[in-house]
Amino acid sequence: PEVMKLEEIDRPVPKDDEVLIRVRAAGVTASDIFIRGSQIPLRMRIPMRLMLGITRPRKGIIGEVLAGEVEAIGRNIQRFKVGDKVCAVTGFSLGAYAEYKCMKELDSKQGCVAHMPANIGFEAATVVAYGGALALQFLERARVGQGRSVLVYGASGTCGTIAVQLAKHWGAHVTAVSGTSHIELVRSLGADAVLDYANQDSLEPGARFDFVFDAVGRAKTSKLKEV
């Protein structure tokens, strides 16, 4: 925080295929912390440094998840109108910590924007956008669907809660792992079985899953074997 500062910049003007969002809430994600502190895993350090900046972030304004209202639209915009409440993941374009952010209407490498669920506020929408984008990406890549078995590790967090719901929605059998205090929450999301972190031995030896979704990066990979 001590290296961050407030600064006045010009308000961006949306291009023909962009919407201008008045940011009402922005999330601070693990990715933001890694980018700001250059805390990048060793195997990804060189390509990520080249992409994001060698000695400091190439983008002066970081932040990759936001929620707000559409302030203006380009002439080719069809899905959104001024006043719409939206949430967005900015991708490598970053910029969510600004007061205004231009986003392309259609999903791209520079992020994606969507209408906010009507029953949540701006702060909650940033969580849905971040967790939802990550969970959706990996579950689609794993082709999770009817008849597949999924283990969600970290099922009560931002990504895990959405992963459980998406996997169930697509017809998978979901086994979830969470802390003791969140077991009922995770069960209410539709998990078929819920295991406690404190008693992971309850998972039967040799248990098989089509896909393991590790939302916290702490799963004991020595116990996992690709089959």
In which residue ranges do the predicted regions lie?
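Local beta-strand N-terminus motif with an aromatic residue
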Residues: 83, 98, 113, 191, ...
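Glycine-rich beta-strand-centered segment in the early N-terminal region that forms part
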Residues: 10-27, 41-93
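Extended, non-globular alpha-helical segments
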Residues: 24, 105-142
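A structural motif shared across PLP-dependent enzymes of the aminotransferase-like
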Residues: 92-107
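Glycine-rich cofactor phosphate-binding loops and adjacent beta1-alpha1 units
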Residues: 175, 189-227
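Mid-domain Rossmann-like dinucleotide-binding core that forms the NAD(H)/NADP(H) cofactor-binding site
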Residues: 125-198
